[in-house]
Amino acid sequence: MNSHLKPTLLIGLVVAILSACSGGGASTSVSVPPLDATPVASGLNPSPDGFSFANFASTASTEEFNADDMVAMFGNGAEICTSTTSPCTLTAEAAAWARMVNQARSSGHCEGLAVMSASRFQEKSTPATFSLQNSGDTTHAIMRAFATQFLNETTNATKAWAKQSPSDIVAALSASLKTGKPEFSLGVYTDGGGHAILPYAVEWPSEKVAKVKVYDSNWPGGDRYVTVDLESQEWTFSFSGKDPANDPNIWKGGKGDIDITPLSSRVTGTCPFCGEKSGVQKTLLLIRSASSDWEVETPDGTVSATNNSAGETTAQPLRSASTTPGAPVDYLVYGTTGKTKITSKSVVAVAGFTGSVGFQYTTSGKNNSTRITCLPSQTTLRWEKLNSTKE
């Protein structure tokens, strides 16, 4: 491949759904359409348009997000590969980004499964998605679609919609689905994690209650849905219940616990660590921990598992929730680049970027309290052990 050749912009199974390298990170605004409380359906159905296999953890496949995936997404220019020879050897920044994606894949690929189902439906791809197997090119395409949630354009769009009310989100979904194209993935969040699903229809059991029908990769071919009460501005969703109408552990939330992400932001997404400026324009951290005793101090303020917003910086569970009780939760911290301090009191794995620093580390023990200080103008980290208690 020519080192200056940009990947083709197609939304398909093998070809990536991204454009080539260039910096990004401007804020995003949204336009909320009027709410039309009439039933609407896009024509997509979990079978045959969803995958027949369930959402899977990274350990379920021997495949990994690799240099070929990075080249498919961003091309093989100097910011991705160390030379023009094949195979590509990733630059330090590209390798760090790939490691972050692989860490994020630990709990599941629901984001990638939802995005690939939507894109294949829009492109009328064959064979039917339900007939595909979780191997080879299919698995790597799902990984690349999963990785789009870490692009600046995608994250900015998601943050903008997270500020809207649940009824605004229903209005946007209804307007989109009328076109016959499922343009949005849907994210729902609780303290136990986040999950990505694909809306394909909106029904109205009553005047003030919307039922958003979704393809849920945890339940292939299943009849799953998110219920939104327009009066209380609350939503409910059965994450783990076999019968979603009678789930004792149903997820509940309101404004800020539900968002949508347009497919267009993924198609126009750009390489987050490429461009004329050295380093990324935003801080992006992936924090994995079974405990909530961590915090991140940024120029905007401090965010944590229990305080998910400070200025332009947010901390939100990653949309890859595990069905295993007590499993570690992944959080995505995204915001203003500047001096960043990550403090944890127990085992925590962190991967990400801030300024020129791309890094990955794991603390050594649950009774060790540590702080990592990242300066965007430097390529080194300052590590402090705040205390250490023998077990």
Predicted region positions:
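Bacterial N-terminal signal peptides that target proteins for export
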Residues: 1-10
